[in-house]
Amino acid sequence: MKVQLLKIPSHLIVAGSSWLSKIIIAGVQLASISYLISMLGEEKYAIFSLLTGLLVWCSAVDFGIGTGLQNYISECRAKNKSYDAYIKSALHLSFIAIIFFIALFYIFSGVISAKYLSSFHEVLQDKTRMLFFTSCLVFSSIGIGAIAYKILFAELVGWKANLLNALSYMIGMLGLLYIYYRGISVDIKLSLIVLYLPVGMISLCYIVYRYIKLYHVKTTKSHYIAILRRSSGFFLFTLLSIVVLQTDYMVISQRLTPADIVQYTVTMKIFGLVFFIYTAILQALWPICAELRVKQQWKKLNKMIGVNILLGSLYVVGCTIFIYLFKEQIFSVIAKDINYQVSILSFMLIGIYFCIRVWCDTYAMLLQSMNYLKILWILVPLQAIIGGIAQWYFSSTLGISGVLLGLIISFALTVFWGLPLTYLIKANKG
C-alpha cells in the first residue's frame, strides 16, 4: 500500500519562507532601534527615522521594470515559452534607470532636504543635503536590486529571494552591533550605510550573476519596447502609491515633535512586522494569480482571494489586541530610552487602517497581476490629495491619531470600494 505524501502548495512554501524572512528583517529593524537611540540620541534618531522613509520612495527607481518583468515571466511560464531575453532587456533598462535617478537625486537633494528636514536645521547645520543624497544612493541600491527578487518570485523559487533578503539585513545588523560594542563613534550617515548598504549590495550581486548567465542571449527592439510599455504603467502606479503611503512621513516631519516622530515610527515598525506576514502571502500569490488569470480559472482565483482577506483581517485584529495589551513590555525592550505614550485611540485606528490595507492591497495585487492599472491611475491621485489634506488637518489637533485618521479617510473614500468593483467587472468580462 502506497502512502501518498501531502503536497504543500508552492505559494505556501514561498509564503512560509517569506514569513521567516520578514520576521528576521522586522526583527533587525526593531532590535536596531535601541542601539541607534543609544548611539544617536532621540533627536538624531528621529532624523534617522525620517530618512528611512526614503526607502519606500527609492523603490520606484527601477521605473516599474521589475514588476513588468515579473508578469512577463509568469505569462511565459504559463505558455512554456522562454523569457531569458526579457530578463536581459530589463537589466539593460534598469542600468539606465539607476543612472538617471542618481543624477536626479544629486540635482534636487538640496531643495528637497531643506524642506523635508526643516525641523532639524539646527542639529544638521550644513550636512542636510549630503545626508539626504547619501540616503537616496543607499536606498536606490535596494530599489534596483529588488528586480532580482521579482525574478525569483516569478520563477516560483521565492524562497531564494527571501533567504538572500534576510541574510542581507542580518549582515547589516551585525555591522551595527560591531560598531556599538567596539564603542566606535558614528553619525546618522554612517549608521544608514552600515545597516542598509548590505541589503542593496547582495541583491545587486545576484543581478550581476544572472546577467553573466544571459550574456549570450539575443535581445531585440521588441523586447525593450514590451518591457517599457508595461513598466511605465507600474512605475506610475508605484509612484502614486508611494505618495499615498508616505504622506504620513511628510506630515510628521512638519507637524510632530521629535518625541512623537520616534513614537509614531517605532509603532508603525512594529505593526509593519504584523503586516509583513500578509504581504508575504500576497507576494507569493502574485505569480499564481497571474497564471490562473491566463488559464481563465476565475472560480479558483476568487476563492483563494476571499479566504486570504478574511484570515488576514482576523490576523490584524488579533495582533492589534495583543500589542496593546502588552505594549509596556514590548516597548520597554525595543525602545527603553523613550517615554512611550501612544493612546488607545491610536491603537484602534492602527488596527482599522491595517484591516483596510488587507482588503485594498489584495485587490491592487490582483489588478496588477492582470496588467490592469487604469483605475489605479484615477483613484490613487485622488487618494493622495484626500490623504494629504486630511492628515495635515487632523494632525494639528489629534497628533499621531490625526495622521492615522487621515490615512483611513483617504483609503475609505477611494480604493476601498473602487478596486474590488473594478476587479469584479474585469473578472466577469473574462
Curated annotation (Swiss-Prot):
GO terms for biological process: O antigen biosynthetic process. It is found in: Cell inner membrane. GO terms for cellular component: plasma membrane. Keywords: Cell inner membrane, Cell membrane, Lipopolysaccharide biosynthesis, Membrane, Transmembrane, Transmembrane helix, Transport. It is a multi-pass membrane protein. The chain crosses the membrane at residues 23-39, 45-61, 96-112, 131-147, 163-179, 192-208, 236-252, 266-282, 309-325, 342-358, 373-389, 400-416. Pathway: Bacterial outer membrane biogenesis; LPS O-antigen biosynthesis. It comes from Salmonella typhimurium (strain LT2 / SGSC1412 / ATCC 700720). The keyword Transmembrane helix applies. This is Putative O-antigen transporter. CDD domains: MATE_like. May be involved in the translocation process of the nascent O-polysaccharide molecules and/or its ligation to lipid A core units. The keyword Magnesium does not apply.
